């Protein structure tokens, strides 16, 4: 019994430590909120802008739902898509693939972080998750490098799908600094995840 209590305490402390680290990176986000707070409109990333110029129909879509109800079936599909896309796509930079610094593209078998996000977004929308619940999100990773993840907006909070992690995490648990994300239903319009940016 003592070992069980001790292990439960250690898990609790490690989870609290991870949350504290993530929240330390995002002091303007409310610690107890299940969803990230937004701070108004902001600029579109150049990669998203150029992607939308090439594929206009992929960037604007009708969406009534800006979030989803998180059921066991939906959760299992989300985890499955995150793991399968992470394992199928080989990580390579845009410079290695296209010879340019930044290009967002649906990947065939290789890509960088934005490409993983676009692939996950496509797979989850095919499953029936409304596009408004799937938000491309620009962040800084644990090493302060520019990065992109997919945020899933649900009735139980915002969850992060990251090509660097097979686990789907609550936004507070991911060791990321949140910068901005697309608005529901339109990859051309973005909202800030921190004030004055």
Predicted regions and their residues:
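Sec-dependent signal peptide recognition
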Residues: 1-7
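A structural boundary/capping signal
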Residues: 19-197
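N-terminal hydrophobic alpha-helix used for membrane targeting or insertion
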Residues: 8-10, 109
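Hydrophobic h-region of N-terminal signal peptides that target proteins for export
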Residues: 10-18
């Amino acid at each position: 019994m003592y070992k069980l209590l001790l292990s439960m305490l250690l898990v609790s402390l490690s989870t609290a430590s991870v949350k504290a680290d993530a929240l330390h990176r995002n002091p303007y986000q409310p610690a107890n909120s299940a969803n990230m707070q937004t701070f108004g409109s902001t600029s579109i990333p150049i990669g998203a802008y150029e992607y939308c110029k090439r594929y206009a129909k992929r960037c604007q879509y009708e969406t009534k739902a800006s979030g989803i109800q998180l059921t066991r079936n939906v959760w299992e599909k989300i985890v499955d898509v995150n793991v399968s896309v992470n394992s199928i796509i080989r990580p390579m930079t845009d410079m290695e693939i296209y010879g340019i610094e930044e290009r967002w593209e649906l990947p065939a078998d290789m890509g960088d972080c934005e490409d993983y996000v676009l692939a996950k977004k496509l797979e989850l929308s095919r499953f029936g998750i409304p596009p408004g619940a799937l938000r491309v999100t620009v962040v800084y990773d644990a090493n302060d490098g520019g990065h992109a993840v997919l945020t899933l907006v649900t009735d139980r909070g915002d969850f992060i799908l990251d090509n660097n992690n097979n686990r789907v995490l609550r936004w507070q648990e991911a060791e990321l600094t949140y910068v901005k994300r697309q608005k529901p239903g339109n990859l051309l319009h973005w909202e800030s995840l921190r004030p004055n940016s």
